[in-house]
Amino acid sequence: MNEDKEQKINIHDILNTRPKLTKKTALDVFFEDLDDNVITPINEYVLDSGSSSSSSIYQALKCSNNNEFVAVLLQKFQNLHIHVLEQQRRLIESKSDLLPISLHDMKYVDELINLLIIHGIDANLSPTMKIPFDSKRINTFKKGQKSAEYETPRWHTINNDTLSQVITVFYNVLTSERSSDYLREIISKGSAYANILLGLIVLHLQLPNRYSSQMITNLEDTQETYTLFGVYTLLVETIQDEKVREPILSKLTTLTLRRPENGLISLIDFVLGVRDAEDIDIEKFNRIYQILMSKPKTMTNLQYLTELFKQIYDGLTFVNRPILVTCLNGLILKFYLRNKRIVNDFLFKKVRSIIFNSPLTDHTAKELNDVINVLISLSKNSSSDLLNDLVTSCPDEDGTTPGQFFLYVWIYALFLKKNQKLDPLEINKLSISDNKSTDSIHFPEQSSSKYYEVVLSLLKSLIVITENFQYLNVLSLNLLNFEHEKWKYLIDLDTQLPYISVKNTDMAELFFEKGSKNSQISEFLQDMDLSIELFMEFLVLLNDEEQSKTLFLDILKRWVHHTKKSEKRSSDNHSGMPSVTDNALILMDLKLLECMNNRFKTKIVNKPKDVLIVIDQLIDVVQEKDETIQEVEADSDDEVEEGEETEELDPNENSSYKIILQLLSTVLSESSSSILLQNSYILKSISRKLQSFNTNASEIDALLASIDNILINGHTTERNDNIEIEMDEERLDKAITSLHDPLVPIKSYGLTELRHLAEKKSPVISLEKVLQIHLDYLKNMDPFIYLNVIKGLTTLCELEPETILPLLAEFYANKKKKNRLDDVLKVGEVFINYIQRQNELFQGKLAYLIIDTCLSIVRPNDSKPLDNRWRMSSMSILGMCLQINARGVSDRIRDMLDCVFGILQLEQPQNHLKDKDDSFLMRRSAVHLIHDLLYSTGFDLLPFEYNYDKLKTLLSYVRDQDEDYMVCEQIDKLLTVLDSL
């Protein structure tokens, strides 16, 4: 009850409280004045004057000319700036989150700025020097509704002083050193910036001087690089005056290098439309390559390549931006194909200088992390030759050999495994460290993996893609190599990030003898176990049966030979003690053999021929070793009893001999008789050698019995005729395994292997199966994968067009609606690539198959309308057909023009739609297709019903009616082409 009463009292008080009027700010008063004395008079004058040619908007403010009118507007703008800054100061002092200018008042700001752009800048530029009104994108402008307030009187003459005054006022606002200026943000983010920059450039051209040149630079510095690309592109596309276009084009072409911190990345983002979430188009990649493969006229080759590759290197560190990395890899490959030395001198040298630390110097955590990221990005390059040059073409002057590149990466992984106890990424997230240097370091998106595992994955990618498996043996020889001679890795305790430090030789000698001998031995054995554990982890990650078997046999041969040499030296040495180094190597190899045998036993003996050959060879080595030892022992001790001597020389007491016999036993028991019989000549050789030993060991007797049983009960036939097929089957197995690998570069490698099998027409896999696998991986979201698939599908089209093209056309038509639109569009890219490669050979029934498929998609379907992106893709393919060989597909030109006329006449803007209207896409593509036809053959192939007069009439009509400024702009250019033909 009390609550109800209290509620009633509160409501009563509220209802009877008089409104509390907020005190007007100076800014509120300003906007009232602006509305009363500028905006309203102009609007009223526009309504009253109508379309009278004798009237002028300047009369609305009682001004006689443009200069007086602009002076009034400038005074208002300067007052606005003062009031906005004061309002910002008050809001900051009161810690308010309010905006300095309300949304209601923003319309006055926009109107004032627009008036200054039109009457202050545009009116004082010649028609060929200014941005066309249609391209200004002023929000209040609609097609056919240009307001009189934006019209300049015909009697007005250009006044450079007025232009200079306007530019100076805007320039001072944009380049002010204030940390916060709301009005500056409005101008820099709107369409005004491009007009201000253009006006300043024109003033500089009219009166060139160092001061105005510096002003242009200062004005550029106020804008982010990405936006500048848009501004300069707009100016280049719209400005007709060649004298003005030339410096603008120069600014655009050099912008990438003049912004070393983000010029290249911004260019890629801008052209690919990454920030606008546009579909990735291969043609856009080619456009970037075309831009960057040509140096600006103002730079030497050395300057250009030096500056460009610095940014390429920095861009490759962004491992979590796959589109950027894919584009950069494509650019690097373009330079590599032009001249290998360019990539080697300007990119690879920097990578090697840090990996090998040559010249000798310290490297920060960021430098070390960056070079690993660069390698991760480069491992995704589509060229195995390029990667092979990186890892094997090492300079001789620093004393390195090809295999050492892999070794140095391995040592780094080994160091991380041993010393990096905490994840630096987690430390950075938790802000445990006060060191903010980690903010600029890019970590791979493998949060579930420890960093040493990332490095192991990199090592795997480099070895597999370059097929340098022979260097696995080099790694196995250096498992105990934790450090470098003159420099070392260290861990920053705060950030857990590794860095490189040059060793202090004096300090190293001072602290060399640390700990007791027993502790040193213990640490040595722990390091050995750690390195073997990591190496086994790497072999499991490698997941290659053949290479694991080859490595096992190499280590086995090495171990037997080392054991033989060690025992021989022990026999020659009166002390009978082998060297420490020999013991360490023998022990390491023995442990590694045991681990590999336990982990890969089945895989090692899966294909027994190589194993049997090695066993056959090693029996000779062991036999030779025993005979040598026997001679030495006989000479050194004649008094040894015969029974004792026999016991010393028993082969079964020899560890290497034991392992060989165990391996032979495993092969005989795990392999089928039919497979073993294919290697009967090796089995016979092994049997003879085992029988030559003077021993009664039951193990040898059992092995001899097994071999005899196989040889007696089977047929000794060889299958030399199927060796090539067996090799192809191995390659296929390897490719399928690679496709299921989690690492992106390895997946791509698997696709490449499949294409190699298809190219050689191997019977182990059909072309249709290769195609289906490629289409499955076309759905992969990683651009590195699906761009590789697009490239591969193009190759398959060239290989067997009669088989592949009909299947791809069916996929692209998507009549059963089973395929995602994104995947369909990617197949469209395949068609474009194929048409370009065919060039003038693109004709005949397969060409018509592609064209007819595209026409069926382009034609409007009222019952089931198709996505305009799909239809535009088909229009692009049709346009490419006309560009490449219009005469070869002339029978379909009438059908193409049917679609074009239908689109331009019937597919008008649909503003009533709830969804975004994208009909302009089709109208743009229709105009493009006409351009492609005229550019290719002129009027020669125009059908009678679509002759010159009808074409010009249609284009002129669309130009007058269409609301899309790009459509209008393209038609203007096309009409110019029509008149010139």
Swiss-Prot record:
GO terms for cellular component: cytoplasm. Residues 630-651 have a biased composition (Acidic residues). Keywords: Cytoplasm, Repeat. Its main location: cytoplasm. Pfam families: RTP1_C1, RTP1_C2. It comes from the Eukaryota. Required for the cytoplasmic assembly and the nuclear import of RNA polymerase II. May facilitate the starting interaction between RNA polymerase II subunits RPB2 and RPB3 and the subsequent interaction of the resulting complex with subunit RPB1. May also participate in the transport of RNA polymerase II through the nuclear pore complex. Belongs to the Tango6 family. Interacts with RNA polymerase II subunits RPB2 and RPB3. Interacts with the R2TP complex. Interacts with the nuclear pore complex subunits NUP100 and NUP116. This is RNA polymerase II assembly factor RTP1. The lineage of its organism: Eukaryota, Fungi, Dikarya, Ascomycota, Saccharomycotina. The gene is RTP1.
